[in-house]
Amino acid sequence: MSKKDYYEVLGLQKGASEQEIKRAYKRLAAKHHPDKNQGSKEAEEKFKEIKEAYEVLGDNEKRAMYDQYGHQAFEHGGGAGGFGGFGGGGFGGFEDIFSEMFGGGFGGGARRQRVVRGDDLRYDLEITLEEAVRGVKKDIRIRTLVQCDTCHGSGAEAGSKVETCPHCHGSGRVRRQQGFFMTETVCPSCHGTGKKIDKPCKSCHGDGRVEKTKNLSVTIPAGVDTGNQLRLSGEGAAGENGAPAGDLYVVIHVKDHDIFVRDGSNLYCEVPISFTMAALGGEIEVPTLDGRVKLKIPAETQTGKLFRVRGKGVTSARGGYAGDLICKVIIETPVSLNEEQKELLRKLEESLEGKGQHRPKHEGFFKGVKNFFDNLSK
């Protein structure tokens, strides 16, 4: 390890900002990189110094240790085996350093008991399109961890002694020095609880929490759509050691509808009409989520034509406006015709034969086909 002042190595003052440290490192590392200075031992050593300095100053925790104790902060405990938690002897000044940095984790005073917020939970809720559009209240059941009623979350039987774990001093975690770096793991003695219980509660086996089914009422606002999430604060799993519970996220899934397809705030549907109405025009009733409305079909309507019924879509969940209902006309071909009906259609067809103005798309299509093959033969 270099004994040079890390700030001097990077050409910085002690109060340099994180951005200044990062810029200095990038500039100097690029200048002294071995690939740019092949064969230069001096550049190689300089690059190592720069890298070492940045590994310390670029890490807020290591930088704080270095600012207070200099190189001494990293001179002890560097063996491959490290140390087994907080409490062992034989580390001299290194132990004192970490006691100050981490609140007495190596010997002296106890650290604050670990408090872990409960897990967030997810519940997938399926609702109908009508419920999504209008809003609805739903009752749901979830299986989750709740505070133990027997011990009130302490994890101990009544009158039982609860002590701070002597191995991790209540943190639930132990740190190990491995060479230049430090790792943190769950305390193997208390399994992360930070405490030692003389007589664990029989109901929760010392955890302070038990699994239970909860019944909840969820209010779904109008205008929600598939993928929307509702957060129920504090309805997730109970936290450890009396920590706050997590949240419950209700994820909305809207069922497919028999008539309507939703796209944002608009609703789409297909409306079948007879070919005579398409030719002559007329009026039909179309469904909406609020009932039926009348829709005028102009004469000479072609299949696939879209008609917009304004304001009959979905009101935005954020309020303010409603989408539209878009009706796509589908012209039905008559089926199960008797001979008399077929003869009438043949006469109609004969009366239209050769008159392109009655069938503009038909004539336009075959004219386009003829032009296509004429061009191929040239």
UniProtKB/Swiss-Prot annotation:
CXXCXGXG motif repeats lie at residues 148-155, 165-172, 187-194, 201-208. SMART domains: DnaJ (SM00271). One of its GO terms (biological process) is protein refolding. One of its GO terms (molecular function) is zinc ion binding. Zn(2+) 2 binds at residues 165, 168, 187, 190. Coiled coil: none annotated. A zinc finger (CR-type) spans 135-213. The keyword Transit peptide does not apply. CDD domains: DnaJ (cd06257), DnaJ_C (cd10747), DnaJ_zf (cd10719). Its cofactor is Zn(2+). Keywords: Chaperone, Cytoplasm, DNA replication, Metal-binding, Repeat, Stress response, Zinc, Zinc-finger. One of its GO terms (cellular component) is cytoplasm. Zn(2+) 1 binds at residues 148, 151, 201, 204. The keyword Hydrolase does not apply. It comes from the Bacteria. It is found in: Cytoplasm. The J domain is necessary and sufficient to stimulate DnaK ATPase activity. Zinc center 1 plays an important role in the autonomous, DnaK-independent chaperone activity of DnaJ. Zinc center 2 is essential for interaction with DnaK and for DnaJ activity. Belongs to the DnaJ family. Participates actively in the response to hyperosmotic and heat shock by preventing the aggregation of stress-denatured proteins and by disaggregating proteins, also in an autonomous, DnaK-independent fashion. Unfolded proteins bind initially to DnaJ; upon interaction with the DnaJ-bound protein, DnaK hydrolyzes its bound ATP, resulting in the formation of a stable complex. GrpE releases ADP from DnaK; ATP binding to DnaK triggers the release of the substrate protein, thus completing the reaction cycle. Homodimer. This is Chaperone protein DnaJ. It comes from Glaesserella parasuis serovar 5 (strain SH0165). The lineage of its organism: Bacteria, Pseudomonadati, Pseudomonadota, Gammaproteobacteria, Pasteurellales. The gene is dnaJ.
